[in-house]
Every structure is written in structure tokens, then in C-alpha cells.
Design a protein with these regions (language model features):
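N-terminal catalytic or cofactor-binding beta/alpha core of small enzyme domains
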Residues: 1-189
Length: 189
């Protein structure tokens, strides 16, 4: 579902990256020391095997994204990093009562303003959507965007879009959701 939505949105971007290797191997959105960097299937591998996974999948993706962002910021331009994810509708017996989450760092005023505008644009597209800020996760929690915010303190906005997987069937996001996100992002950009 997230890749399907990403493909819908990439025409709006000056550049785009996606990672097809799933988190069952390695979670590229986590910092290198995070306890959930490796999954239940890979956490017991040898150090050598883990390093091979990091070398083959983790570092190339993260380094490519970071290098592209750096080259744009060095030119004096601003980067909006819009990261697309999905979340499970039910976690540990808790029903998550939202359709879309917008994750940002509340201490960064430009991210906060962008998120407010984007949320309003989404509501204009589909008033029925339940949209929450920093849910189902905190926007400043451990993650790739959090790392990038620390590295690029100026001219970088990191926003994570979390869409409920109830809108996904056979890896395809419902068209009405894709279209609402596309139009809302186009309008705010």
C-alpha cells in the first residue's frame, strides 16, 4: 500500500527514493543502534551476517537519500522530505481510531505549519477522514527523519505520512485516499 501511494505521489517530487526490502530483514527507518533495527527473523544472525545486511541494504539507501538532500541544501534550497508509510489498524488489541497520521517535530515551526495546511487540504478533499498529528507514532521518535533533522538543522522539513492499512487491499491503496493525498500535497506545495 505505501509503495502504491508513493508511486502516485512521485510526480510531485523533484526526486524520490523508495526501499523495497521489507522490515523483516532490516528496518531502514531506524537508527543503527535501535533495538528493532533487525526483525525477529534476523536479530539472532551473526554479527558478520548483520553487517552484510547493513552494507547491502541499509547504508546504500540511507546514504543515497542523505546525499541528495545535502546537495540540494548546499545550493541554498529548501527540502521537504515527505515519507510515506502505512500502519496496522489494530495493535496489541487496541483499535487505532484514525485514518491518517501526520508526523512532525512540534518544535520545528515550519513542519508544524506545513502539517496544519496539509491536514486542512486533506479535509477539504475528504471531510470524512480522521486525521491526527503525531499519531500513531510521535514525529520526533527514533527514525531516519529524526536523524536527518539533526544533520540538516536549516532548510529541511521532515514529514511522515502514516495511512491506515484498512485502505489497502492486495498492496493497492484505495484510489480515493491516493487522490485525496495527491491533491492535498499538490495544493500545499
Amino acid at each position: 500500500g505505501a509503495l502504491d501511494l508513493f508511486n502516485e505521489l512521485k510526480d510531485l517530487a523533484d526526486f524520490s527514493f523508495y526501499h523495497e526490502t521489507g522490515r523483516l530483514l532490516v528496518e531502514v527507518n531506524r537508527s543503527k543502534g535501535h533495538s528493532n533495527l533487525f526483525s525477529e527473523f534476523t536479530k539472532n544472525l551473526s554479527g558478520k551476517q548483520k553487517n552484510e545486511i547493513l552494507t547491502q541494504y541499509y547504508f546504500p539507501f540511507r546514504d543515497s537519500v542523505e546525499k541528495q538532500i545535502s546537495s540540494i541544501i548546499e545550493k541554498g534550497e529548501k527540502v521537504l522530505h515527505f515519507s510515506v508509510h502505512t500502519f496496522t489498524p489494530k495493535l496489541n488489541e487496541e483499535i487505532r481510531k484514525t485514518d491518517i497520521g501526520l508526523l512532525y517535530d512540534p518544535s520545528r515551526s515550519e513542519e508544524k505549519e506545513f502539517s496544519k495546511k496539509f491536514k486542512q487540504n486533506l479535509k477539504n478533499q475528504n471531510p470524512e477522514l480522521k486525521i491526527r498529528f503525531n499519531y500513531p507514532y510521535l514525529g520526533k521518535a527514533d527514525g531516519f527523519i529524526t536523524y536527518l533533522r539533526k544533520k540538516f538543522t536549516e532548510n529541511y522539513l521532515g514529514i511522515e505520512l502514516e495511512v491506515n492499512q484498512k485502505f489497502v487491499s492486495q498492496n493497492q491503496m484505495e484510489y480515493r485516499i491516493k487522490n485525496a493525498v495527491f491533491l492535498a500535497l499538490k495544493e500545499v506545495g
